[in-house]
Amino acid sequence: MSATRYRRFLKLCEEWPKDESKKGRDLGTFLRQRVASAFREGENTQISDPEKCDQMYESLARINSNVYKEKFPRAKDTSFTGVTVEECRLLLATGSMQQTDEEKKGLWKTLMERFSSKPEDVPPEKAEK
């Protein structure tokens, strides 16, 4: 029975879209990692709580097939702030997040990072002293 569960989760992972703009923060990537860790032995993995496993699969399958989007349609594709889906995608992209983190740093910290000598930049004779 665990072989069937394993195959169902693999199929779900194949169907789940990857968002390349969110490197390391993508739900599809996280899901694949969790399935790989939960089914370490592949089809031979013994599942301690089969009911919980089935419930988790059903929940993820409903999300993937947009059951809730169809059940609760929205008049507009905007958030409560009025930001559109495309604007949200741009703001949450990894490049934008890194740029925002850079802007959050103070002037002093930014200057110190740029002009401080790094250990690998120092010649070996000076590093030993």
Swiss-Prot record:
Q: Which InterPro entries match?
A: UQCC2
Q: One GO CC annotation, please? A: mitochondrion
Decide whether keyword Cell division is in the record.
no
Q: Which Pfam families match?
A: UQCC2_CBP6
Question: Which residues make up the transit peptide?
Answer: 1-13
User: What subcellular compartments does it reside in?
Assistant: Mitochondrion matrix, Mitochondrion nucleoid; Mitochondrion
Keywords, A to Z?
Mitochondrion, Mitochondrion nucleoid, Transit peptide
A Gene Ontology biological process in which this protein takes part is:
mitochondrial respiratory chain complex III assembly
> According to the lineage, what is the superkingdom?
Eukaryota
Summarizing the function annotation, the protein's role is: Required for the assembly of the ubiquinol-cytochrome c reductase complex (mitochondrial respiratory chain complex III or cytochrome b-c1 complex). May play a role in the modulation of respiratory chain activities such as oxygen consumption and ATP production. May be involved in cytochrome b translation and/or stability.
> Know the name of this protein?
Ubiquinol-cytochrome-c reductase complex assembly factor 2
Q: Which organism is it from?
A: Danio rerio
